[in-house]
Amino acid sequence: MRVLVQRVCSAAVTVDGDVVGAVRPPGQGLLAFVGVTHGDDGDKARRLAEKLWYLRILTDEKSASDLGAPILVVSQFTLYADTVKGRRPSWNAAAPRAVAEPLVAAFAEALRALGAHVEAGVFGAHMQVELINDGPVTVMLEL
């Protein structure tokens, strides 16, 4: 499981012209792109959620937990693209929808259980993601 996290001033996800999830904090928030691979499970989702919630990448080395920063979760199977051969990426390392969708949901629920305000995109939908990256700060988390 991989989570590409970006520190943002704001972020929003739109599907079919409708905003389905947005974080517009007074300070900073996080945008978390979540990719799932074969062999991932609920325990990994929970541990990554905990890692993200306490990760000190906000102002003054604070975490989302410290500041109550909101988190926008967006499923992103392309985090497991394999570009070693040829010019067309392979998606074989990405878990199928039946595996990935409940694990992305479990990741978001684990964040909520920790106390996070979580917004989310729509799994499998074609989404437009708008963000204002702060820093920029972009970090890859992986278990």
UniProtKB/Swiss-Prot annotation:
One of its GO terms (molecular function) is tRNA binding. Pfam families: Tyr_Deacylase. Signal peptide: none annotated. GO terms for cellular component: cytoplasm. The keyword Coiled coil does not apply. It is found in: Cytoplasm. Gene3D superfamilies: D-tyrosyl-tRNA(Tyr) deacylase. GO terms for biological process: D-amino acid catabolic process. It catalyses: glycyl-tRNA(Ala) + H2O = tRNA(Ala) + glycine + H(+); a D-aminoacyl-tRNA + H2O = a tRNA + a D-alpha-amino acid + H(+). Its main location: cytoplasm. A motif (Gly-cisPro motif, important for rejection of L-amino acids) lies at residues 135-136. InterPro entries: Daa-tRNA_deacyls_DTD, DTD-like_sf. Its EC number is 3.1.1.96. An aminoacyl-tRNA editing enzyme that deacylates mischarged D-aminoacyl-tRNAs. Also deacylates mischarged glycyl-tRNA(Ala), protecting cells against glycine mischarging by AlaRS. Acts via tRNA-based rather than protein-based catalysis; rejects L-amino acids rather than detecting D-amino acids in the active site. By recycling D-aminoacyl-tRNA to D-amino acids and free tRNA molecules, this enzyme counteracts the toxicity associated with the formation of D-aminoacyl-tRNA entities in vivo and helps enforce protein L-homochirality. Homodimer. Belongs to the DTD family. NCBIfam families: D-aminoacyl-tRNA deacylase. A Gly-cisPro motif from one monomer fits into the active site of the other monomer to allow specific chiral rejection of L-amino acids. This is D-aminoacyl-tRNA deacylase. It comes from Mycobacterium marinum (strain ATCC BAA-535 / M). The gene is dtd.
